[in-house]
């Protein structure tokens, strides 16, 4: 599928991959001549909810940045593959890489500010972005990670309890599982069984940020009231030990749900990706 509307957006699905990821290419009215920005949303969200409705796409377009958005498998307008492999984090990262190249991203070249790729992730998207940045050193220029964590909460998700709840309404004892499942059920665009497949695939590929650490400059952001805020200095230490230059930003009064809507977050990210000093 393809089309254009506000913000000069082109949309299509990724050809030749099972997930049929829904991709949006958003063109700025005045191009700043900088590398494109890939946005990766969180669990049970979508590019529209995570990035468009919250003003991220418009903020980046106003800064002259070309923006690439992707709906993860089973989310938003992407397909819901039946095979488990399509939901594995490693497969998703491979599909994101293909998406970036299809959108015109190319390896970093010294002295060429339009080469390479900047990546912004939120929640689950931060996990994917961290691993993507660690494995794609010739492509990724800078990272912005919102609501990141030292461990993936989905790894502790109680799949059996979730399946029982969906089958007959049996109460879920684990609070995190109950919260994540109910959040996923709120969005009609989500394929709940596809999302459970994603959880199962994530359990099969445990997240260990120390195993592969990005060497690029990164901005780590969390809401003050988000329990994941405690992960920021730990991730920063990992990044620093790998030779990165991490910066941290804590958003006063914000939690994991509403941090992504923060104007201060967007402004800091736009400046950071452009290599500018904090305002």
Predicted regions: what is each one?
Residues 214, 220-222:
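Short beta-strand/loop motif that positions the catalytic acidic residue
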Residues 60-79:
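Conserved alpha/beta-hydrolase
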Residues 194-210, 225:
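Active-site nucleophile elbow and catalytic-triad environment of alpha/beta-hydrolase enzymes
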Residues 254-264:
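Catalytic histidine-centered segment of alpha/beta-hydrolase-like enzymes
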Residues 44-57:
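The serine-hydrolase catalytic nucleophile loop
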Residues 127-135, 140-170:
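Flexible "cap/lid" loop of the alpha/beta hydrolase fold
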Residues 227-234:
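Conserved alpha/beta-hydrolase "acid-adjacent" motif
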Residues 90-115:
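Conserved acidic catalytic loop of the alpha/beta-hydrolase fold
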């Amino acid at each position: 599928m393809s089309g254009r509307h506000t913000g000069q957006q082109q949309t299509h699905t990724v050809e030749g991959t099972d997930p049929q990821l829904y991709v949006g290419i958003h063109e700025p009215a005045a191009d700043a001549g900088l590398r494109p920005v890939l946005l990766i949303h969180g669990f049970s969200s979508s590019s529209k909810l995570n990035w468009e409705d919250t003003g991220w796409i418009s903020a980046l377009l106003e800064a002259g940045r070309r923006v690439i958005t992707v709906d993860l498998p089973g989310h938003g307008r992407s397909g819901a593959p039946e095979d488990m492999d399509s939901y594995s984090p490693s497969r998703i990262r491979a599909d994101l890489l293909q998406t970036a190249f299809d959108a015109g991203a190319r390896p970093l070249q010294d002295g060429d500010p339009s080469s390479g790729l900047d990546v912004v992730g939120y929640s689950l998207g931060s996990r994917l972005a961290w691993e993507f940045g660690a494995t794609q050193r010739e492509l990724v220029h800078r990272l912005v990670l919102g609501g990141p964590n030292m461990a993936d909460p989905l790894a502790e998700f109680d799949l059996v309890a979730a399946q029982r709840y969906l089958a007959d309404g049996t109460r879920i004892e684990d609070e995190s599982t109950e919260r994540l499942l109910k959040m996923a059920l709120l969005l009609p665009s989500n394929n709940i069984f596809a999302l459970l497949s994603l959880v199962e695939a994530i359990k099969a590929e445990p997240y260990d940020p120390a195993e592969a650490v990005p060497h690029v400059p990164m901005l780590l952001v969390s809401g003050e009231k988000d329990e994941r805020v405690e992960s920021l200095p730990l991730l920063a230490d990992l990044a620093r030990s790998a030779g990165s230059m991490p910066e941290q930003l804590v958003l006063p009064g914000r939690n994991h749900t509403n941090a992504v809507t923060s104007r201060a977050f967007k402004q800091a990210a736009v400046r950071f990706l452009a290599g500018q000093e904090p305002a």
